[in-house]
Amino acid sequence: MEDKKIAMEETIRSIFDFIGDDRHREGLLDTPKRVVKSWDKLYSGYTQDPREILGTVFEDGACDEMVVLKNIEFYSMCEHHMLPFFGKVSIGYIPDQKVVGISKLARLVEVFARRLQIQEKMTGQIADTLMEVLQPKGAMVVAEATHMCMVMRGVEKQQSVMVTSAVRGLFKRDARTREEFMGHIRH
């Protein structure tokens, strides 16, 4: 792993050359190490199994009402431009037998967000993992995010927000269930 980090640091120095900066100037001397260290966290989702994040579940047949955790802040990196996108995710599910601690839902968002990603895929991955591990009656995930690839380059639209949703099980079949979830996350 150390050899990979050294090679990556040299790659960062090559980027300085490519953009026309001086790799030897004082402000850039430690930048390659800092970039590699920051990438350890930014891309830490590759080292985690999302199913294990939800691994501790509680069997609770009495809980059959909607569970919602909203406004889970996240940041991710666009797989097309390697620029950040960030925003909030809201998750809802209706347990069948299993519930999970709410911090696990936030960690599930993080594990998928900390990968090169597109928002549409991330939203679906969160919902699919909930369905696989918790086997609820249904799940719904809504993500809202600002994409720096649209803010800093391309069309340069600073106020645009992308909204994606993933709808599974009862949420997909029953409009009232979707409406209840949307009512919870609007307030």
Curated annotation (Swiss-Prot):
One Pfam match: GTP_cyclohydroI
Origin superkingdom: Bacteria
Protein name per UniProt: GTP cyclohydrolase 1
EC number: 3.5.4.16
SUPFAM superfamilies on file: Tetrahydrobiopterin biosynthesis enzymes-like (SSF55620)
Stated family: Belongs to the GTP cyclohydrolase I family.
Pathway note: Cofactor biosynthesis; 7,8-dihydroneopterin triphosphate biosynthesis; 7,8-dihydroneopterin triphosphate from GTP: step 1/1
Keywords recorded for this protein, A-Z: GTP-binding, Hydrolase, Metal-binding, Nucleotide-binding, One-carbon metabolism, Zinc
Biological-process GO terms, alphabetical: one-carbon metabolic process; tetrahydrobiopterin biosynthetic process; tetrahydrofolate biosynthetic process
Organism this protein belongs to: Wolinella succinogenes (strain ATCC 29543 / DSM 1740 / CCUG 13145 / JCM 31913 / LMG 7466 / NCTC 11488 / FDC 602W)
GO MF terms, alphabetically ordered: GTP binding; GTP cyclohydrolase I activity; zinc ion binding
Catalytic activity reported: GTP + H2O = 7,8-dihydroneopterin 3'-triphosphate + formate + H(+)
Sequence positions that bind Zn(2+): C78, H81, C149
PANTHER family the record matches: GTP CYCLOHYDROLASE 1, GTP CYCLOHYDROLASE I
A single Gene Ontology CC term: cytoplasm
Subunit structure: Toroid-shaped homodecamer, composed of two pentamers of five dimers.
